[in-house]
Amino acid sequence: MGRDSVVELSANQYPNAVHPQGYQYLTQFEQQPLPTFTYEIDGHILQKTVFMVYGKNATVIEYKNLGKKDIPLTMTPFLVDKDYHSLFHESPVFDFYFEKVGDILKIHSRYGSDPLYIK
C-alpha cells in the first residue's frame, strides 16, 4: 500500500453488485461483546467497533490502529436521513449543510432536521 493509496473498507449491496468491496480486507469479525471488524491491508491492521449508546439516539463507530505504523484515515459517511418505513429516491438536489464545532462536525441533511455529529 503506497503512501497515497486509497482503500475503501465499506461494502454496500446493490442489485447485481457489491460496491465497494471492502469485505475483501476483512480478516476477523467478533459479535460479542460488541460487533468488531478487523481489516488487514498490506500489513496494516485496523479494527472497527460499532455500538449504540443505551437510552440515546446515538451510534458510535470507533477505529483503532493495531499496527505499528500510522495510517491516515479519511471518513466518507454514507448517509440517508429518512424514516425506515419511507422510500428514498435519488435526487440531484440536497440541502446538506455542516458546521465545525471544536473537534466535532455537525451535519444537517436538510433544513430543520436533527443533526448528525461526527467526532
Language-model-derived ranges and their functions:
Residues G2, Y39-I41, N65:
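Short acidic, glycine-rich loop/turn motifs
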Residues M1-T36, R110-Y117:
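An extended acidic
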